Design a protein with these regions (language model features):
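P-loop NTPase "switch/coupling" elements that transmit nucleotide state to mechanical/effector output
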Residues: 24, 28, 34-38, 43-47, ...
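Intrinsically disordered/low-complexity terminal segments and short unstructured peptides
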Residues: 4-6, 160, 291
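Charged/polar low-complexity intrinsically disordered segments
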Residues: 3-6, 10, 40
Length: 362
C-alpha cells in the first residue's frame, strides 16, 4: 500500500480549514504556543510530586530495547498557593512516595514510603538535559539504521506536552530538539552522504485517526501491510527540504491538533499525537569518509546506506472524571482517551510477556 507523498508547498496550497467541531488552539510557531507547565486540579493540602536529589546519568540504560524513564515536575505556583505538599523523593533510579511529614524528617531515605524503580529518573533536569538523556540516544540508534520511538505517558497536567514539545528557546522539548539534531547530522555529512527526511503527523481523536498536515475532518483507515505492518495509506507524507520547513510542518500539525480547556488542565491535549520521521541515508558516489564537524554522531560506526523511522508520540493524559469534572464532549473525549490508554497497557503487557517467552497475542 503506497503512501501519499507531497511537498510542503503543495501541502500549504491544498490545506483545508480544520474541523469546526473539534477544539483548536490559535496558529503560531510550534515552539511558542505551549505554556512552560500545565496546570492541574489542586485541592488544599493536596500531595503532589516534586523532585529533589537529581539522579546520576545511566548510559547503559539506553542500550536496552525498551527504557522506562520517569520525569517529575515541580509544584507550580498555583499548587503552592493552594497548600499542596511534596510527597515524592527521587534517589538514583528510585522514586519514593511517602507522607510529607516523614519526607521532611527523613529526607531521601530509600526505605521511605512506597518505592518504584525505573531505568532513568529525571527531576529538576532542564529540557536540554532531558534531550541529552533521551533524545540523543534515539538519534544515535536511528543514525545507525534502527527504528526508535519515544512515548510520553502520564496523567493530565503532568507535563507530557511540555517535555515533548516545550516552549521557546531553552524550553524547547524533545521533538524540536530531535529535529534540529537530525539536520545537524545531515549537514555535517552532506559531502559524503545524501540524507532525505519524510515527515507525517497524525492524531488519534475519539478513537479515529486524523491527518494533521492536511486536516480534512474525515477519519483515515488503518490497514495491515504485509511488510510495514499497521499503516495509514491515506496519511500525508511530506519530503522535507530543510530544518525550517520541518519546523513549519510541525507548527501546522500542532495547530490542527484537538486541544481544549478542562478543570484539570488549561490546555489539555484531547488526542494522541504521532510525529513520524523516515530518515534515509545514501553514500554519494565517489565520496570518501569524513564529516565537516563534530557532534553526537562523531563516534558512531554507521552504515553507508540505511533507512530508519523515528516516532515521537505525545499521548493524551489519563483522567479521573470525578476529579476533572468533565461533561458533554469533554467527557466523551476522556472516555476514549482512557480506553485507548488501557489498550496500550494491554499491548505493553503482551510484549513484556513475549519477551519472557510466554505466549501472548498483541
Amino acid at each position: 500500500m503506497g503512501e501519499k507523498t507531497r511537498t510542503a508547498s503543495q501541502d500549504a496550497r491544498s490545506r483545508q480549514p480544520p474541523d469546526p467541531n473539534s477544539p483548536r488552539v490559535p496558529h503560531g510557531r510550534l515552539d511558542a504556543r505551549l505554556p512552560r507547565q500545565q496546570p492541574e486540579v489542586v485541592c488544599p493540602r493536596r500531595r503532589l510530586a516534586v523532585a529533589s536529589n537529581r539522579r546520576s546519568p545511566n548510559d547503559a540504560a539506553m542500550d536496552s530495547k525498551v527504557t522506562v524513564a520517569v520525569r517529575c515536575r515541580p509544584l507550580m505556583p498555583r499548587e503552592e498557593r493552594a497548600g499542596a505538599e511534596a510527597v515524592v523523593v527521587l534517589e538514583d533510579r528510585r522514586v519514593a512516595v511517602g507522607d510529607p511529614v516523614e519526607l521532611a524528617a527523613r529526607g531521601s531515605s530509600p526505605i521511605l514510603g512506597r518505592n518504584f524503580a525505573f531505568d532513568l529518573v529525571l527531576g529538576g533536569d532542564s529540557q536540554a538535559e532531558v534531550h541529552e538523556t533521551l533524545g540523543v540516544p534515539l538519534l544515535r540508534h536511528a543514525w545507525r539504521g534502527l527504528n526508535a520511538s519515544i512515548f510520553a505517558y502520564g496523567q493530565t497536567g503532568s507535563g507530557k506536552t511540555y517535555s515533548m514539545t516545550g516552549g521557546d528557546g531553552e524550553s524547547r522539548g524533545i521533538i524540536p530538539r530531535v529535529c534540529e539534531g537530525l539536520w545537524d547530522a545531515a549537514d555535517a555529512h552532506s559531502q559524503t552522504h545524501e540524507t532525505t527526511v519524510e515527515a507525517s503527523y497524525m492524531e488519534v481523536y475519539n478513537e479515529r485517526v486524523r491527518d494533521l498536515l492536511v486536516p480534512t475532518g474525515r477519519p483515515l483507515k488503518v490497514r495491515e501491510h504485509p511488510t510495514k505492518g499497521a499503516c495509514v495509506p491515506e496519511l500525508t507524507v511530506v519530503r522535507v527540504r530543510g530544518r525550517n520547513e520541518l519546523a513549519e510542518l510541525l507548527a501546522v500539525g500542532s495547530d490542527a491538533r484537538a486541544t481544549a480547556a478542562t478543570r484539570g488542565n488549561a490546555r489539555s491535549s484531547r488526542s494522541h499525537a504521532v510525529v513520524s520521521l523516515v530518515v534515509s541515508r545514501r553514500r554519494r558516489s565517489g565520496s570518501s569518509e569524513g564529516i565537516t564537524e563534530e557532534g553526537w554522531w562523531s563516534d558512531l560506526d554507521a552504515p553507508g546506506s540505511c533507512t530508519s523511522t523515528i516516532r515521537l508520540v505525545d499521548l493524551a493524559g489519563s483522567e479521573r472524571v470525578a476529579v476533572t469534572g468533565t461533561d458533554g464532549a469533554r467527557l466523551q473525549e476522556a472516555k476514549a482517551i482512557n480506553k485507548s490508554l488501557a489498550a496500550l497497557c494491554d499491548v505493553v503487557s503482551a510484549l513484556a510477556a513475549n519477551s519472557r517467552k510466554k505466549k501472548a497475542f498483541v
